[in-house]
């Protein structure tokens, strides 16, 4: 049974907060948290991420970045990352969690590009890819319990 999902990106201000919000919406009984491998703790979500999510009726304006820690990793039943490099880094740092770390795009074999400091179109593209990943994961997570 998956009780806690940890979503990870680099800064925890663009992709992972968007994925966290979508997963929370789709899986109300599951605790979904997010963190960044290189996050500046306390920073708000990127204004473009807030805007693109608001266009889809989801408010992430209260999000604050947090640094990925061993405690967060150990607490998670499933860790979803945006790309292969993040997956490898977490697996190397936390070998006991290797079997719990997957890309959000694992099923369709895609990574989600970082839209940070890019045009709004990059955020829209990232959100579309995140939604594809969430849509692929949600039935599998529900099937586990």
Swiss-Prot record:
It is an enzyme of class 3 (hydrolase). One of its GO terms (biological process) is lipopolysaccharide biosynthetic process. Signal peptide: none annotated. Pfam families: LMWPc. The keyword Hydrolase applies. Its EC number is 3.1.3.48. GO terms for molecular function: protein tyrosine phosphatase activity. Keywords: Hydrolase, Lipopolysaccharide biosynthesis, Protein phosphatase. Pathway: Glycan metabolism; exopolysaccharide biosynthesis. It comes from the Bacteria. CDD domains: LMWPTP (cd16343). SMART domains: LMWPc (SM00226). The keyword Repressor does not apply. The active site is at residues 9, 15, 114. It catalyses: O-phospho-L-tyrosyl-[protein] + H2O = L-tyrosyl-[protein] + phosphate. May be involved in assembly or function of the EPS I polymerization/export complex and/or the EpsB ATPase. Alternatively it may function in the removal of the terminal phosphate from C55-isoprenyl pyrophosphate in order to recycle the C55-isoprenyl phosphate lipid carrier used in the synthesis of polysaccharide repeat units. Belongs to the low molecular weight phosphotyrosine protein phosphatase family. This is Probable low molecular weight protein-tyrosine-phosphatase EpsP. It comes from Ralstonia solanacearum (Pseudomonas solanacearum).
